[in-house]
Amino acid sequence: MKQIYLDNGATSFPKAPGVGQAMKDYIEKVGVNVNRSSYRATAEAALSTLTVREDLCRLFGAGEDPSYAIFTSGVTMSLNMIMKGALHPGDHLIISGMEHNAVARPATQLEAAGVAVSIAPCDGDGVLRLEEFEKLITPKTRLVVMQYASNVSGTIQPMGEIGAICRRHGVLLAVDSAQAAGHFAFDMRKLQIDALCFTGHKGLLGPSGIGGFVMNEEMNKALTPLIAGGTGSMSALLEMPPTLPDRYEAGTPNLPGIMGLGVALRYLQEVGLDALHRREMALTERFLSGLRGNEHIRIPGPADAKGRVGVISVDFLRQDNAEVAFQLEEQYGILTRCGLHCAPLAHKTLGSYPEGTVRFSIGYTTTEEEVDAAIRAIHDLA
């Protein structure tokens, strides 16, 4: 039985061509550190790392200075660094009712430490209610953190309007792009995003364990480094150096991961995000169209592909969703994710809490035949 991978919302598979080989080559043929020594190999590795930073800035529309592209282990660490680095007791934080636990759990920790937290409501499709969101802003509001696209329903937030509201009130905006980066083109400067947190292993088609955030100077001025340690620079200082990116990159970076991510970014440049997005949206619309009219399932989020990415949750009204997910693999070879998807806030907003849903997420290698097979399986099991 052929395996059909529809769990790209958890991690992309397969990775972009050449990612694994680039990582293997670095480990087996290069192996050096960066910013710690002065011989040629380490200088070449540092140059390769700089190129990846430049590619990230270009991809996200972040400006010309690659030092504002910071590497971390992924979007979760990046969000923690932004939220805990920018907020202090007495400050006010706003998140949305669609957030992943990568935002909700740090927010809960901050609330226990004296930061006021508000959850901005969203409509039944998961779209932020802009007027109600703006009314939550107070003189003490320091930071807004929002996901760009939902890992449950695929709902895309109106980030341009959100950015304009934040700028009008002088509030910093940080964005969780885990389900958006690599899926469609956007420009963080035009959207007025102060920090864009990303992960390498989902839409960017890179390896696990590498991600980061790209920020502007306003966010940099607001941040205190969350992690301190060696950087290979200004070693006489017992404080973190003021220069970027070293200020936020204590310890040895994940160099094999960075090299793999670099190959993935070049692949995205060669193929083109617009082409990938058009294909993903066509498959998403095919998927949604094939399920319309089935009264035994419910699909949270926008009714068609417009306004969402290729993440489709299905709530089986007559069956246990966990049992359906098991049968999808056992009978049809279809790999999905079932449950709350680390996003209880989103499921409460969408009306699928506490049961959760079965999530199907489309990738860059997903075919029409695979989508059709999933549609048939859903009808069979519903």
Question: What are the residue ranges of the model-derived segments?
Answer:
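Pyridoxal 5′-phosphate
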Residues: 1-382
